[in-house]
Regions:
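Active-site-proximal alpha-helix that buttresses catalytic centers in soluble enzyme cores
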Residues: 1-134
């Protein structure tokens, strides 16, 4: 189940699902949880959740199902992946197709992976330049 940031009865229709790979080490997810909290704080009108491809819970399908049960009709999936490998080229489209069939009343869209966002790449590059400056 999604660890709802907003646990009261849903009066919102839109949700954002941050989608990460997952890992065996529970601490691995902390940066993603921090991002979820930051977005939820800045966008209180939006339900913000975190879901995983594997190794951690909730799975994307379980998270979307819970959001639909809670009355969300617009769900945006944001892949928190730096590069498009097999998971984004094969696994995510397959998952999204299945979710769109199972939850036809909800509009499910997907954003570009964060690794394709110019502002993020520029921020990483800037941090690396500053970190190695003498």
């Amino acid at each position: 189940m999604c660890a709802a940031v907003n646990s009261t009865l849903n009066t919102k229709h839109s949700a954002l699902v941050l989608f990460a790979h997952g890992a065996r080490d529970a601490q691995w997810s902390e940066p993603f949880r921090a991002i979820r909290e930051a977005v939820a704080t800045r966008r209180p009108e939006l339900t913000v959740e975190l879901a995983f491809l594997e190794l951690m819970q909730p799975a994307l399908g379980d998270c979307v199902a819970q959001l639909v049960r809670d009355g969300h009709t617009r769900i945006t999936v944001a892949p928190l992946f730096l590069a498009q490998g097999g998971h984004l080229k094969k696994d995510l489209p397959r998952l999204l197709k299945d979710l769109s069939v199972r939850h036809a009343a909800a509009k499910i869209t997907v954003l570009a992976p964060i690794g394709e966002v110019t502002e993020l790449l520029n921020a990483i590059s800037e941090w690396l330049v500053k970190s190695t400056a003498r």
